[in-house]
């Protein structure tokens, strides 16, 4: 837990008692509540209360308040299956509800708890270019959308054990750079340089400079397989 203050703020926002609790016990409790937000059967998304009151009132009047993140996706899939919902008003309402569950649910959840786990970003100097890879170093490029994997790679690549191992193999050190959204994650938290954007992921390999490009779950060109 890199940002315990933010965890405490979210807990207070969600009405969770924090007094006297170990920060990691609280983190596990909040994790359980956060996962319930994906499939709970009662109530509405906890994050909606962050919106201005007049916006909340508009959502309520229109009947588009998202209930749970995965629930709205499943509902939309069901409604658009053959022989189900045919009224355009109902389909549009569910589309709006589903969109809100994405932005005010899944996206906000991922952002807030990534900050809790890995630290809240702050302005930081970094570089962006294919030239950030260093010929004399072991070059590892992280790519994708899951910050958990890239954070662990950065953590271990910076360890004395791994740097000494790289040097024993003839390199001067280890350079971690990034591509696509994972690149932005490690750039804004660690200052890791950006080798390129989504469209440049194959170019990173074509340089011949990187020893490994590590991908996770999304935005991966088939050629990288």
For the regions a language model picked out, list residue spans one by one.
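Metallocofactor- and cofactor-centric catalytic cores in central/energy metabolism, strongly enriched
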Residues: 1-225
């Amino acid at each position: 837990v890199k940002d315990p203050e933010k965890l405490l703020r979210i807990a207070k926002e969600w009405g969770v008692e924090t007094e006297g609790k170990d920060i990691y016990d609280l983190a596990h409790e909040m994790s359980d509540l956060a996962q319930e937000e994906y499939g709970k059967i009662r109530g509405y998304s906890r994050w909606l209360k962050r919106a201005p009151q007049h916006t909340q009132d508009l959502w309520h009047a229109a009947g588009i308040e998202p209930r749970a993140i995965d629930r709205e996706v499943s509902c939309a899939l069901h409604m658009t299956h053959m022989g189900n919902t045919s009224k355009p008003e109902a389909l549009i309402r569910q589309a709006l509800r589903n969109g809100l569950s994405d932005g005010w649910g899944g996206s906000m959840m991922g952002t807030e708890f990534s900050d809790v786990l890995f630290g809240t970003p702050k302005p930081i100097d970094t570089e962006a270019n294919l030239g950030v890879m260093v010929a004399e170093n072991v070059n590892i490029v992280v790519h994708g959308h899951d910050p958990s994997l890239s954070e662990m790679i950065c953590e271990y690549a910076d360890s004395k054990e791994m740097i000494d191992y790289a040097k024993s193999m003839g390199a001067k050190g280890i350079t971690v750079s990034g591509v696509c959204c994972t690149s932005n994650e490690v750039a804004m938290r660690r200052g890791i340089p950006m080798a390129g954007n989504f469209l440049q992921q194959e170019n990173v390999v074509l340089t011949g400079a990187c020893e490994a490009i590590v991908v996770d779950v999304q935005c991966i060109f088939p050629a990288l397989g």
